[in-house]
């Protein structure tokens, strides 16, 4: 129910989604076949579990709500979303909270979000422009309308055009890019990313009759270099980001909590004011501090190296790395999964 992911500590006390997006990460968590959203524990219990989690740090740990088990704005789910946010906000917490949706956001929803006083809430509105219902059955018009509603009604609540998944030959045409450019005018920032082409997702799409989207599966998201180049050229001078936390940080006028400034080539498209913010907070930690956090994460490692780009460990899990990374605002990598220069943490597919 609570798990650390790259963009934050993920709380999922409602499970089940009827939207049936073929590429959904719920395939990886064995809950894709749960179509009816159901409550696992009460909102109050969920919040208590979250704030007492060993990795939670008040005002620091980024939080995600319902990002791997349902869509937070579905009927019957959004009441739990808002109640959870209100319970956290009432505690005076100033943590960043990420809410990802491809469903309908109404003016009344935004009005309730705007009443929050402490949390830094970001709504990431997923749009792909994919028209093949076997891959994505949800009408992309919902995302367009939600972005407009947020643009017209939100001030404190920030909106991201979450342009994903970009897939070669499916939704990477010049027309798709032009449509994304129009939508970006309604958002505080745009984040673009590729496809998780894992075995579970490929199997589901094959069973739906979809020809393999890529010739191979990959641990990391696939976004070929040619697509990235066309997107970054089209968005030149606009607030476009490769990484979710970078877009979220820009929208709120803060430095990236994932410390990606160390991996400088990621920042070559970032607006200058954002680069300056991240420059000021990029502080190389000492080994003793990393060892202290590793112990809290129950990570046994005598092989810590730190340079100006990142901390490098061995034998770590993603959850252990993300906890250290978010606590220090400094990139943490494992030697068994090297980050190659210029790949921006993506799969090698399309970069060979």
Language model features with spans:
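Conserved Radical SAM active-site core
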Residues: 1-122, 316, 323, 327-352
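Alpha-helix capping and helix-coil boundary motifs
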Residues: 42, 175, 284-288
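Conserved AdoMet/S-adenosylmethionine-binding subsite of the radical SAM
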Residues: 45-228
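Residue-level marker of positions within ordered structural domains that often coincide
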Residues: 26-29, 71, 166, 236, ...
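A broad, structural surface signal
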Residues: 19-22, 181, 229, 233
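C-terminal accessory extensions appended to soluble enzyme cores
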Residues: 202-352
